[in-house]
């Protein structure tokens, strides 16, 4: 990290403000060559952390833009190095011209996530907090943003560190026993060590249990609309999203492929898939669509099974119901409530639970449907920021938990201290990967490569 990096930190589309970002040992010199304060003093001599009015000038003294600049001296900066931001007008042309000037005076184009990677490597944040930065940027719901903010504040990091410290106490005791084999573990010490391992196991179990909700919160709930052809699935999709996303006709089989859309219902983010109607068909294209419908249902967390309340159930309805039953959660939606209902709702409720009546045509019952979906995915009771939200985190916790369980069992059944120590060390290694204390450089590069440039 001996070089200085630069990047455009804001979206490259016309806007009121655009930001150029710098970090590294040569930040002050690069600034002095590009940004010229109105008060006449070089930027390197300006008061730190104070916005300074000036101009960005090219090599021939021509004005590129009037701008504001702020210097953040290291180590008390985002990256732990000297950092700076130039706040220009948000023209992509102006921002790119400004970036070219920074690069021409010795800065290097930053890679994706490189600013945050430097913050991690310089000890300004751990790996969990660094991942929270990306989660905040990518957040599609307020709940996701709140959880990421809590994680950035260190909520998850502190929970992990508490388990890490407990296991360090266990391993230090077993190091002493291994180094001095003539010492036996007294009964009281054995119980204390068992309690410590049990406490760690319970906390890791709780953390791992948050992953499924963290994934649904971050990625959204995979939701499939199922039903026979022409039952109103596309009309329901359009009613939910609020515009004509899918083609609606009176011709059965109009939807021949899956149609996907995202929808925020309160705190629940749905990844909606409108499927081809479930039926046997001789049409090759429609048959492929039906097969995709079945596969979408297998991947779904929620199936919305749509039935036509104005006509009796048919074989195609039974086929759709059989597919819906494979989903972890399912809601039966009886469409066309604006027409007389001829279905046996009691039988449907006995098989599927609650049955909701809606009219995709008039909008009747849509509010109740949204409430029912929200009730299936309530806001959790976990502290804000203490949800595992990606597979890397879950895998590390899963490995740590397995090692802790093995260590507890080994100690309980009188295995030799070195056996217990090996498992306890394995748990520490996994937790070290989780928060970045002990992690391979190539894994760090992979994690930060997923970030956007400028962050």
Each model region followed by its residue ranges:
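A glycine-rich (often HGG/GG-containing) alpha/beta subdomain
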Residues: 1-146, 150, 154, 331-332
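Switch I (G2) and immediately adjacent beta-strands of P-loop GTPase domains
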Residues: 52-65, 69-73, 253-281, 299-302
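Structural motif
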Residues: 89, 307-310, 336-337
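Conserved beta-strand segments of alpha/beta enzyme cores
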Residues: 108, 269-271, 354
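Generic enzyme active-site microenvironment
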Residues: 272, 306, 333
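Inter-motif core of Ras-like GTPase G domains
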Residues: 286-310
């Amino acid at each position: 990290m001996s070089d200085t990096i630069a990047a455009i930190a804001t979206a490259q589309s016309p806007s009121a403000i655009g930001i150029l970002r710098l970090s590294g040992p040569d930040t002050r010199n690069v600034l002095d060559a590009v940004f010229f304060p109105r008060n006449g003093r070089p930027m390197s001599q300006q008061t730190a952390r104070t916005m300074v009015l000036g101009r960005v000038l090219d090599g021939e003294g021509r004005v590129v833009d009037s701008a504001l600049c702020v210097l953040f001296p290291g180590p008390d900066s985002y990256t732990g190095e000297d950092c700076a931001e130039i706040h220009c007008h948000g023209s992509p042309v102006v921002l790119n011209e400004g970036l070219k000037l920074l690069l021409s005076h010795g800065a290097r184009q930053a890679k994706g996530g490189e600013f945050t990677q430097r913050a991690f490597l310089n000890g300004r944040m751990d790996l969990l907090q660094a991942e929270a930065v990306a989660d905040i940027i990518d957040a599609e719901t307020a709940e996701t943003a709140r959880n990421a903010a809590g994680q950035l504040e260190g909520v998850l990091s502190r929970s992990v560190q508490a388990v890490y410290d407990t296991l360090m106490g266990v391993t230090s005791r077993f190091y002493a026993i291994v180094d001095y084999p003539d010492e036996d573990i007294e009964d009281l010490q054995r119980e204390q060590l068992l309690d410590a391992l049990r406490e760690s196991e319970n906390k890791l179990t709780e953390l791992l249990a948050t992953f499924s909700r963290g994934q649904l919160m971050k990625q959204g709930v995979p939701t499939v609309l199922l039903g026979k052809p022409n039952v109103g699935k596309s009309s329901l999709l359009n009613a939910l999203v609020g515009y004509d996303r899918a083609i609606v006709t009176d011709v059965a089989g109009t939807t021949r492929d899956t149609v996907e859309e995202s929808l925020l219902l309160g705190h629940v983010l749905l990844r909606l898939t409108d499927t081809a109607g479930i039926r046997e068909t001789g049409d090759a294209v429609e048959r492929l669509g039906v097969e995709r419908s079945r596969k979408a249902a297998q991947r779904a967390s929620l199936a919305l099974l749509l039935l036509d309340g104005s006509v009796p159930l048919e074989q195609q309805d039974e086929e759709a119901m059989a597919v819906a039953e494979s989903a972890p959660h399912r809601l039966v939606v009886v469409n066309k409530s604006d027409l007389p209902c001829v279905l046996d709702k009691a039988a449907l409720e006995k098989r599927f639970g609650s049955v909701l009546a809606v009219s995709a045509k008039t909008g009747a019952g849509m509010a109740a449907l949204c409430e029912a979906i929200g009730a299936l995915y309530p806001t959790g009771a976990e502290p804000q920021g203490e949800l595992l939200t990606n597979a890397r985190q879950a895998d590390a916790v899963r490995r740590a938990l397995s090692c802790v369980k093995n260590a507890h069992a080994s100690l309980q059944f009188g295995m030799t201290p070195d056996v217990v120590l090996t498992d306890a060390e394995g748990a520490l290694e996994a937790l070290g990967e989780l928060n970045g204390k002990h992690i391979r450089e190539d894994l760090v590069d992979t994690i930060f490569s997923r970030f956007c440039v400028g962050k």
